[in-house]
Amino acid sequence: MKQSLTLVFLVAIGYATAHTTSHDYSGGYGGGCYGSDCDSGYGDSGYGGGCTGGDCGGGYGGGCSGGDCGNYGGGYGGDCNGGDCGNYGGGYGGGNGGGCSGGNCGGGFDEAFPAPYGGDYGNGGNGFGKGGSKGNNYGKGYGGGSGKGKGGGKGGKGGKGGTYKPSHYGGGY
């Protein structure tokens, strides 16, 4: 019995060590992604997962914090905080219910989607998109328009976003 328990324990330690030292943090649907390299699209930090570290690739609904949060980083309803929150980082996350803060909460326009998502309905920050049309405090659209609404008031519609076209897969910009 002791030998069996020891074997199980050693296998568990080996498994944990292999997974903590690995740079493959694909969390999948709903999984969490933590580390220096959590990249790309519909998997890492997944649907509803959280992502923290230097490079957080995102996923719909995942929270992304760190120096570089790209590729759906922040996602639908998530928060994107850090120096660069790009590729839909902050768009619909920094968007509907989320916050986008940092030097760059980018996004731009992609023909596959009907609207420029970067910073849409964002609460402050820099949003390269529609920006601020429903911001709780203020929003700016880097296309010439800006709107302010205090106390939950509806802000004016910001200018159209830039021409930046994010990659659907792969981490960072």
Curated annotation (Swiss-Prot):
It comes from the Eukaryota. Keywords: Repeat, Signal. Residues 145-173 are annotated as: Disordered. Residues 1-18 form the signal peptide. Residues 145-162 have a biased composition (Gly residues). This is Eggshell protein. It comes from Schistosoma mansoni (Blood fluke).
